[in-house]
């Protein structure tokens, strides 16, 4: 096998769910990936070594903006939140637009509507509505088992009526409420315990959270462990926060209206992130879930992809 030539492909990197560079969750976006061969997509993702890389294609429905394919270092995934927010802002800015906008991004879960709002400081806030309303799975393993996985005490994990639960808005997460922000910071993923208990379960990725009493009743601190997708810890996870919105809304006493929460994630990783989540309820049923945040451009460049002949 000899290298005969190379092709060039433009990319941009952004930090998502933050208003400043070097915070939030890193993302690489290829605005036009049509010429990138299928077999190279996962290799490119691993080269960046970010939580996700997005490859953009013309939409199947011409009324939509783009079709997205989202890759983690482990596999392609049907839906992830921070690539949705980051890609929407990137595509909006790269199109030359400067004001508010609506777009629809085609992802593995289906069409994802996104609203973009221009902020006074020149940045943009993007909010997406989940294509799939929250689906609730079976109860989680015992608090003792979860404590072993998270290097915590069983007492750190809340029980009924706020027990851990599997939730999916397109990508399942085990949502685990903890008693304190201190417990959130203290948690550590024990991979072997995770592998023996959760790896083969429906909701194998873990999202832990606790109310932050210093920031208000609707403010939470969170962390996300995604070992099944080769991401030990993620600094900002829109899809998991969508699940959190579903979890909180399902337990809220309010039967109607819009519920809103703010989540800080990534603090322990040195990449602080802020995610805004909402859920609509009608007659006690969840009718919509939305996740939003800002993003900033960090780098841009050209990937030189070798072409090989045998």
Predicted stretch roles:
Residues 2-80, 85-310:
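Active-site proximal loop and beta-alpha junction motif in alpha/beta enzyme cores
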């Amino acid at each position: 096998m000899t290298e005969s030539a190379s092709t060039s492909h433009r990319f941009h990197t952004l930090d998502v769910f933050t208003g400043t560079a070097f915070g939030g969750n890193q993302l690489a976006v290829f605005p036009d990936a049509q010429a990138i061969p299928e077999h190279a997509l996962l290799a490119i993702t691993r080269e960046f070594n970010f939580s996700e890389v997005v490859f953009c294609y013309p939409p199947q429905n011409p009324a939509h903006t783009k079709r997205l394919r989202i890759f983690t270092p482990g596999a392609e995934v049907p839906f992830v939140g921070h690539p949705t927010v980051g890609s929407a802002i990137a595509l909006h800015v790269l199109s030359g637009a400067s004001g508010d906008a609506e777009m629809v991004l085609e992802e593995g879960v289906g069409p994802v509507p996104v609203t973009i709002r221009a902020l006074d400081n020149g940045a943009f806030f993007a909010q997406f509505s989940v294509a799939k309303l929250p689906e609730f799975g079976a109860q989680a393993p015992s608090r003792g088992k979860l404590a072993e996985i998270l290097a915590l005490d069983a007492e750190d994990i809340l029980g009924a009526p706020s027990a851990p639960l599997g939730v999916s808005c397109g990508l399942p997460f085990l949502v685990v409420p903890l008693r304190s922000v201190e417990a959130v910071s203290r948690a550590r993923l024990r991979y072997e315990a995770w592998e023996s208990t959760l790896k083969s379960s429906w909701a194998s990725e873990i999202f832990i959270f606790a109310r932050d009493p210093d920031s208000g009743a609707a403010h939470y601190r969170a962390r996300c462990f995604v070992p099944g997708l080769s991401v030990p810890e993620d600094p900002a996870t829109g899809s998991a926060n969508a699940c959190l919105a579903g979890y909180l809304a399902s337990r809220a006493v309010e039967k109607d209206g819009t519920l809103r929460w703010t989540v800080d994630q990534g603090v322990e990783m040195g990449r602080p992130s802020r995610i805004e989540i909402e859920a609509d309820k009608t007659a006690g049923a969840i009718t919509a879930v939305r996740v939003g945040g800002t993003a900033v451009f960090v780098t841009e460049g050209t990937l030189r992809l070798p072409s090989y002949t045998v």
